[in-house]
């Protein structure tokens, strides 16, 4: 069954494994998430658990949000997500989900919002090569040919535009270490997002059985 938790990206560091191998890891701080709602087939048409992360000032929340959080005996949350394919009997409204639900060696999918780079050209956005700088070349950093078909640009053509700031999921990352006393997960490799950005960690959908 699927496990999941919301947290924030602290940054990257490196640790030694038990075999003495140096491994780069991303530090994810995931303070306890509160179960705000348990959705069932009878009431909602599907099964899921709704979790909230990071308290919001009540001044910034509206009455529906306050009432929804009050049912779980907690304050309104800034971030709310749903986790599907869960064992509903393991969750109660108002209970907490902590990093203890994961263990070392678990394979997870990590979702975050990539760092925004604004408007960029083909070379930075798509990693294309630049043209010659001399010998009469007029092709330095421009996109190049638009294709052999006239009067239109083919769909999917790689062109300059907005780079980053998109929701991205990196699959099949391994949890190297769990530090419950600090609410921290150490995940092997890098994950999308800037420091302090929201990160969603859940059980891998395509992990080897």
UniProtKB/Swiss-Prot annotation:
InterPro entries (alphabetical): Ribosomal_uL3, Ribosomal_uL3_bac/org-type, Ribosomal_uL3_CS, Transl_B-barrel_sf
Gene3D superfamilies: 3.30.160.810, Translation factors (2.40.30.10)
Keyword terms of this UniProt record: Ribonucleoprotein, Ribosomal protein, RNA-binding, rRNA-binding
GO molecular function: rRNA binding; structural constituent of ribosome
Polar residues bias locations: 112-122
Subunit details: Part of the 50S ribosomal subunit. Forms a cluster with proteins L14 and L19.
Chain's role: One of the primary rRNA binding proteins, it binds directly near the 3'-end of the 23S rRNA, where it nucleates assembly of the 50S subunit.
HAMAP family attached to this UniProt entry: Ribosomal_uL3_B
Family per record: Belongs to the universal ribosomal protein uL3 family.
Protein name per its UniProtKB record: Large ribosomal subunit protein uL3
Species for this entry: Lactobacillus johnsonii (strain CNCM I-12250 / La1 / NCC 533)
Gene: rplC
């Amino acid at each position: 069954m699927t496990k999941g938790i919301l947290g924030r990206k602290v940054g990257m560091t490196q640790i030694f494994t038990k075999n003495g191998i140096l491994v780069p890891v991303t530090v994810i701080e995931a303070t306890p998430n509160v179960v705000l709602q348990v959705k069932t087939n009878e009431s909602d048409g599907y099964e899921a658990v709704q979790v909230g992360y990071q308290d919001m000032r009540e001044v910034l929340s509206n009455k529906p949000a306050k009432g929804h959080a009050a049912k779980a005996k907690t304050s309104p949350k800034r971030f709310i997500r749903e986790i599907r394919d869960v064992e509903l009997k393991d969750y109660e409204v108002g209970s907490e989900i902590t990093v203890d639900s994961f263990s070392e060696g678990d394979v997870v999918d990590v979702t975050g919002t990539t760092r925004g780079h604004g408007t960029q050209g083909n070379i930075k956005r798509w990693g294309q090569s630049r043209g010659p700088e001399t010998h009469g070349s007029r092709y330095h950093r421009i996109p190049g040919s638009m294709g052999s078909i006239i009067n239109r640009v083919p769909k999917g053509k790689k062109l300059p535009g907005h780079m980053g700031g998109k929701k991205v999921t990196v699959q099949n990352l391994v949890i190297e270490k769990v530090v419950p006393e600090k609410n921290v997960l150490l995940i092997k490799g890098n994950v999308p997002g800037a420091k302090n950005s929201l990160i969603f960690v859940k059980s891998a959908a395509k992990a080897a059985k």
